[in-house]
């Protein structure tokens, strides 16, 4: 029993650490709500076939990184490695045709078998946003702007937006024929991993991080040169609208993302403050995915943000806990019962109330209130309990008491006035 540990790549998060998580999540939810984006929740566990069909069998995610197993019914199941395929499945299964235009978000744990490092775990948390049924360039721009504004709202520094276009299916097919010929000619100059991708997922070679391969790729055909006039004009319109919004961008023609379902717009937002794991947000358009999975022809675009990396980058001010508003010091059988009832009443005022359950001496309870930097204290002893009243007072920064007030347990008006004048005052 003493040797039981969490699995490598998973992390226990304790209250002090979760202060920042909760503050970040609160800001995220506020921003999403203001943009009229609604929440969707899908299972963590899905049929493996969903990700093979949705993400692509030749991708690293499916071939190397998924947590897959047979359940007791001999069905192949997988812990979700990303959220878009699950959202698409949920919409198809529940009748997307009845509501084909939606803006959705989800947040929760995902699972990939990768080498753990700072900001990357095997169980990680992701915020995803999906605009379903939207095919205009304006929807691309809105979703990029939303991601950009969220990251800036969180105080993340040194942000850089990289964009590319992957064209449509015909554009990529024409490019891939030329690219495969070039790859066969230059195969020996590529790193081993890229050589193995030629037959499985050649487009991913463009995104190689190998220095030698990146240098060789400088002379490779560019997908951009195979775009139809329609795809090319779409990309020009994307850039124009980003410039109107004064969102700076850099074109990266090797940006293809790691999943097979992307079409047209692909983008990443990086932070120079993160070092090697610079990508904070990634996304793009996936107009063919829902149809490919058996649904109606439905355009869509989305992005995902890794929360672990977000937590590393978010401002220090988000680590500051909210101080206790009222600490209830109580001792004695009747006093403890009255204190419990009072704590429930006080929480209805949206106050952070802590009830001391220790039964320790008054002096020790005072020290605990001081340690928590409580804004105020309530004292209920045996005498107060007999008289049906309690003592309430503010604490100053040194922990010393201010002028106290005695309030009857039945005098809700006096209690409410004290709270409004001392704790809820702007």
Swiss-Prot record:
GO terms for cellular component: cytoplasm. Belongs to the class-II aminoacyl-tRNA synthetase family. Homodimer. Keywords: Aminoacyl-tRNA synthetase, ATP-binding, Cytoplasm, Ligase, Nucleotide-binding, Protein biosynthesis. GO terms for biological process: histidyl-tRNA aminoacylation. It comes from Prochlorococcus marinus (strain AS9601). The gene is hisS. The keyword Protein transport does not apply. Its EC number is 6.1.1.21. HAMAP family: His_tRNA_synth. InterPro entries: aa-tRNA-synth_II, aa-tRNA-synth_II/BPL/LPL, Anticodon-bd, Anticodon-bd_dom_sf, His-tRNA-ligase, HisRS-like_core, HisRS/HisZ. GO terms for molecular function: ATP binding; histidine-tRNA ligase activity. It comes from the Bacteria. This is Histidine--tRNA ligase. It catalyses: tRNA(His) + L-histidine + ATP = L-histidyl-tRNA(His) + AMP + diphosphate + H(+). SUPFAM superfamilies: Class II aaRS ABD-related, Class II aaRS and biotin synthetases.
């Amino acid at each position: 029993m003493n040797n039981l540990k969490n699995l490598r790549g998973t992390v226990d998060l304790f209250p002090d650490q979760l202060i920042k998580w909760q503050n970040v999540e609160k800001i995220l939810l506020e921003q999403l709500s203001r943009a009229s984006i609604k929440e969707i929740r899908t299972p963590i566990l899905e049929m493996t076939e969903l990700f093979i069909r949705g993400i692509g069998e030749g991708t690293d995610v499916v071939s190397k990184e998924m947590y897959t197993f047979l359940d007791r019914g001999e069905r192949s199941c997988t812990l979700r490695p990303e959220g878009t395929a699950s959202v698409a499945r949920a919409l198809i299964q529940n009748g997307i045709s009845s509501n084909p235009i939606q803006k959705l978000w989800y947040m929760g744990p995902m699972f990939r078998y990768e080498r753990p490092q700072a900001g990357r775990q095997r169980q990680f948390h992701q915020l995803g946003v999906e605009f379903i049924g939207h095919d205009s360039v304006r929807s691309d721009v809105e979703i990029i702007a939303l991601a950009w504004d969220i990251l800036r709202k969180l105080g993340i520094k040194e942000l850089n937006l990289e964009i590319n276009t992957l064209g449509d299916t015909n554009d990529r097919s024409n490019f891939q024929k030329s690219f495969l010929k070039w790859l066969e000619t230059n195969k020996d100059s590529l790193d081993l991993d890229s050589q193995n991708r030629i037959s499985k997922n050649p487009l991913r070679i463009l995104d190689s991080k190998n220095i030698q391969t990146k240098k060789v790729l400088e002379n490779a055909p560019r997908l951009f040169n195979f775009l139809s006039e329609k795809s090319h004009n779409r990309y020009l319109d994307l850039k124009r609208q980003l410039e109107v919004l004064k969102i700076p961008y850099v074109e990266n023609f090797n940006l293809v993302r790691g999943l097979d379902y992307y079409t047209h717009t692909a983008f990443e937002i990086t932070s120079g403050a993160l070092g090697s794991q610079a990508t904070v947000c990634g996304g793009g358009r996936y107009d063919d995915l829902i149809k490919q999975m058996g649904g109606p022809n439905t355009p869509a675009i989305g992005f995902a943000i890794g929360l672990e990396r977000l937590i590393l980058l978010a401002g220090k001010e988000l680590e500051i806990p909210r101080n206790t508003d009222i600490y209830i010091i109580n001792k004695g059988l009747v006093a403890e019962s009255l204190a419990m009832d009072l704590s429930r009443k006080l929480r209805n005022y949206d106050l952070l109330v802590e009830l001391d359950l220790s039964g320790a001496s008054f002096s020790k309870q005072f020290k605990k209130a001081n340690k928590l930097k409580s804004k105020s204290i309530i004292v209920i002893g045996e005498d107060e309990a007999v008289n049906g009243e309690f003592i309430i007072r503010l604490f100053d920064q040194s922990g010393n008491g201010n002028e106290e007030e005695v309030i009857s347990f039945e005098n809700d008006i006096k209690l409410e006035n004290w709270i409004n004048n001392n704790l809820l005052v702007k």
